[in-house]
């Protein structure tokens, strides 16, 4: 009876295990199949298989390599396991052990095969996570830039060294484990042998000697790679990054001593083991190797060198190495071609307003995107389930001229549905998409109602900015899957057009054309209601990965994404543009930084970055197009070779979309964060850090009355810069101040068109307006303080605060005008009630020490000009002409 119970229990356990295994296989196969269908829906089926093959060919190839090393060595060792066969006839206890040993003889598959597989997988495991880097190892070309320390191509260190370090470390583990296990096999066999007092077989000794040589060679190779790792030393931070005098003049020679002494010592030791000669040389090499290793580990000598050589003469001793770091960092962050224009600001009181300024008033953005979010939501949300996730800035051709605008996509937000309406049918079949966008001019007046250039669900536009297909199925909201078209008759719910969910004509989903597909999709989504729903037709498609960031990361996880995706409204459809970056953390001698990109769960560390790709996502069908805008990026060149057909040239981009390209926000912020220190290209100046910059800061008044200092973020501005006559330039502007100070030092302009490329929609170049120290130039914080001290403005602010309204001052916009700067700051008021709709109340202008406030830009500019003229007459000051008198200076 007991046997039957044990048998039934064993059978039940086996059935449960098999059922669990079968379930895991079904789930894995379903996930694989559905993901393949999804890639096929994007016309990326070949790309899907290519990534799949790369991953498993590289991972499998490495595993097979280590498997062969283990198995062939175990097999070879088994040939020398020579237990006396006569002993097996004996019935003694000892013969049992010898019979057990017999299993390891003659390359027995039951032992060596599973053991080799287990060890190979264990050793190759790190490669499974680095297969993407392995692609660059094989496909990335030379960088075409020589690193300054060893004179090698930077691409060798960027793409080859990281994989070689991984190979060396795992090969050393493999060789060491193999040598120990083979030696143990030989020892056990020899101890059980009747002739255990005899010397080991010659073949066994040769085998072990070869394994020892392998360990020594791989270890020596590790020392060679340690030489390259010196390029990433951070011991001299925060002064500079990379190797210094101690690393290159002390540690590097010791590394070579370790390499030579190890190789020669091992060869001498093996020679002594075979011929009993060379012991003295082997011991000498061992002593030298131990001494060199000890000198590298012990900090006494480096500390003495640092104390008595480096610190007394830091610039002289480290000058060469500081220069290496500066040059490498500027190259790695694409900062080595920045143009700097030195400007001496107009003396105080001599400023004049250029007549051309009035022509550009319509492009001065007095509405901050962060305040427009509430305005759009309250006035254009229209339905409770619509929301505006982000407000973007762009420029469009309106009535024959370029106008800067704010715009936002009206997306579906299922979290705003009433709790009782959040059922399966509503979420997946009815409320499936957003609808349209809103566009407002960036320049508005406080004495007029909000002006709209695209509004309402009927896509009304008085300036021709409407679109034929405004449905937004793919956006920034984290949406669940949707099934369209379906049998539900949607009227005035998810869009303005009736029956939109019945007539979906896009190709951005996985077709549900059979019962099997419906079953597999139900398993994939863990949702049985999809299988049993009667509202799904044979033409229905499953739309998923609908968040555009998730969508892009699913296809190309090797690209970093800008935190500011933006929409483009064309006459046909609405599109999203996402700036993508290639990053690496292995550019030699380049300073590292950390940054959190869109979609990242944590900050990533890198010391090389390029904005090489612009990704266009169709908001209607979710199609993805990758356009190359930097053909010189070696990282992207590697991916282009690895994935032919995925990337296309920017010239293939539709003109209306290409016209909306711009200098990306995150890239500019990263570059300026690094350039704030690394613009000091002279090692002496760099060491002193006397001219380090910082992002300008300004005081912001919170709703509770407190004032906090916040960094002035880069902002987009449409203007006309010198070099391209009559060309409106959409640029990023970022004011920089000396570190610890508030006066303006530099006005950085990202995306300034070069004179030789005026016809391009945007430029990748950066221009710096660097202001002389001879004349004080106020920074945003100082201008804000002047506004606070203006009695007339303070009086009006106090009156508003007493009327149950909350007053907020927006960001300070800096407009360069010749040798002067015009500061613009909008003033908003909003009710303290639960419904908050900010209103533009006033516009403040400041130039020099004059501050004025009016209801519109034009009125404020007139008042400012009157005050300037009056001041100059009163003081007898001769006004300075705003027309440029040196290269690069410009009227706006």
From Swiss-Prot:
Print the keywords alphabetically: Cell membrane, Membrane, Transmembrane, Transmembrane helix
Membrane-spanning intervals of the chain: 7-27, 57-77, 107-127, 163-183, 206-226, 252-272, 281-301
Gene Ontology cellular-component annotations: extracellular region; plasma membrane
Pfam families given for it? UPF0182
Entry annotated with the keyword Membrane: yes
Q: Where in the cell is it found?
A: Cell membrane
Give the record's membrane topology.
Multi-pass membrane protein
Which family is this sequence assigned to? Belongs to the UPF0182 family.
Which HAMAP family does this chain map to?
A: UPF0182 (MF_01600)
What name has this protein been given in UniProt? UPF0182 protein MCA2716
Write the lineage as a comma-separated list. Bacteria, Pseudomonadati, Pseudomonadota, Gammaproteobacteria, Methylococcales
